Structure formats: C-alpha cells, structure tokens
Curated annotation (Swiss-Prot):
Pathway of action: Purine metabolism; IMP biosynthesis via de novo pathway; 5-amino-1-(5-phospho-D-ribosyl)imidazole from N(2)-formyl-N(1)-(5-phospho-D-ribosyl)glycinamide: step 2/2
Domain of life: Bacteria
Keywords recorded for this protein, A-Z: ATP-binding, Cytoplasm, Ligase, Nucleotide-binding, Purine biosynthesis
Keyword Flavoprotein included in the entry's annotation: no
Protein name (database record): Phosphoribosylformylglycinamidine cyclo-ligase
Location within or outside the cell: Cytoplasm
Gene name as annotated: purM
Pfam families attached to this UniProt entry: AIRS (PF00586), AIRS_C (PF02769)
Transmembrane segment boundaries: none
GO MF annotations, alphabetized: ATP binding; phosphoribosylamine-glycine ligase activity; phosphoribosylformylglycinamidine cyclo-ligase activity
InterPro entries: PurM-like_C_dom, PurM-like_C_sf, PurM-like_N, PurM-like_N_sf, PurM_cligase
Amino acid sequence: MAEQQKGLTYADAGVDIDAGNALVERIKPAAKRTARPGTVSGLGGFGALFDLKAAGYQDPVLVAATDGVGTKLRIAIDTGEVDTIGIDLVAMCVNDLVCQGAEPLFFLDYFATGKLEVAQAARIIEGIAEGCAASGCALIGGETAEMPGMYHKGDFDLAGFAVGAMERGADLPQGVAEGDLLLGLGSNGVHSNGYSFVRKVVELSGLGWDAPAPFGGDSLGRALLAPTRLYVKQALAAVRAGGVHALAHITGGGLTENLPRVLPKGLGARIDLSAWELPPVFRWLAETASMAEPELLKTFNCGIGMIVVVAADRADEIAALLAAEGETVTRIGEVIAGEGVSYDGRLL
C-alpha cells in the first residue's frame, strides 16, 4: 500500500499557532505587572473582565478611545527600534481619555503582521505594558493576527483601545469661560502625528536613519522615535485639585485644530508664541521643508503636548502642582471671546 500523502497544515499556509501561543506565554508577566484594582482576569480567555466597583466607582460613566501611531511605525520597522512604539500606542489612547476627565482603567491591543516573529512582537507588547503601567491602566487583552500575504516581510501594524471612567457629572470640558488661562505641558518631540511629513522631510534631506540627528542628540531614527509623553497621572492630579475646566491633547491638527475642540461656541483662544522656545526638531523640520509657521502650527504639537485650561485664580496653584509632578509648565495664553485660535509673537 502506498504511503498516505501528508495533508496540508495551517503552518504550510503561513500561520504558526505555536508561535502565537509562545508569544502569549512570553508577555503574560509584563501584562500581569499592569494589574490594578478592578482587574479580574488575565490573558488567554475569550474576553477580559474588569470590576468597576472594585476600582472604586459608585456611579461611573465609561469613556472609550481607540488610536494607532500612524507612519511612525515605518521608522520603527526600518530601524528595528521597536521597544518604545508600544508606549506611543498607549499614550495616544489614554491621553485622549484624560481630556474627557476619565481615569484610564484598561487597555487592549491589536498587533497584525505577515509572519509572527515572537521576539519582535514581545518587545513591542512589553512597551505597551510599560505605557499601561505608567498610566495606571491594566493591559487585560488583545489580538495577535498573523496574516500571510497582507503585509510585506517585516512589516506590522498596531492599534489600541482604552476604556476609562469618571463619576457621573465629572466629565470635561466643563465651565470654560472667557479669561481662563492656558497652561502648556511640554512634549517629547514629534510624538505620534505628522510622520508622513517627517518622513518626506528626511527623504528631502538625504539623511539615513543612522545619521546623527541634525538637531542634536542621538541618531536621526532614534531621535524621531522618542516616545509620546504620558500625561495621565499628572493631569488627573490637577483635575482632582479643582479649577481645571478642560484638557486638550495636541495631536494631528496641532495647536490650531485641537484647542478649539474643548472650547464652547463663542469662545476662542489667544496664544503667545514667544512664551516658549520651539524645540530644535521642529525648527529643523520647518527649515528643511521651508514650512510656513501657520502650517507648522496646524501639523505638529510644536513643543506643547497637552494644554490645561484653568480658572485664572487657580492657575498658579495648578501650575505648581503640575511642576511638582515633573511637568514643564508654561503659561501660553488665555481664553477669549470669539472663535478659533489666534497667535501673538513668532515661533520661527
């Protein structure tokens, strides 16, 4: 009798279930380190459980946010520097939650690739866990998708989903009024927006990712991969102190587009651009691309990653509290009658 022909396996089609299982086991300790009050289940179930009552909430309202890190991923992939891209993913979600007045509670990630490389994926997800731990947010689940034929070799994509809560009636923005002051919290560089433009500028410059950064510091690739700052704990401390009327996360759209999102109809903002120094990375991008200042202001954070809108009589107290939490705090402007954002002074 002829030997029976071996049948096709899932691995033959390019999906390695054993690699997926190995990844889950490898990242379990990192996920476990993010556990917080309310965490009920660990990784591996069909769904993840979270107990709002155990987290201390009486009459909670849930807030959800989802995001990615855009084409910053391309730099991480091309340089092999993937250890902090997970921090970016978490920051893009939890910083948005805080702007609603919510405390981040738990996080789920989606990691997709053509061929799962366990060591690479573990580095990425350990970065996600680091961001979660720094935000008091539990990493309670996720999805790893190995999809042959969908991605070029070595490529991957990331998405994150975060849920937070606040007690009913504590949502932001709330009480924003003419005369409120704007406190700017320093950014850590470009953060996670505008990277299609950044990559185009690097292409125009003729520099490689391993070249020294023209604006100082490490290699160009590493400098541009500086992770997005997490503002959660310090922003929540300010909110709980009272006097904070709104928070604006400065992401895609820059100062020009993001601040109006938290201002009620009939109110605008005046920002003094001479109040802070434009970080060198933005000056280099603008000069290399001959970028006009208005375009810069509606593309990048320009050194201000979060704006805190505060009652004028509480501004000094809130600024001191934020500084004590390690923030670089700058009074950058005020709320005025009108619409949109107007600027005094120059950055460039």
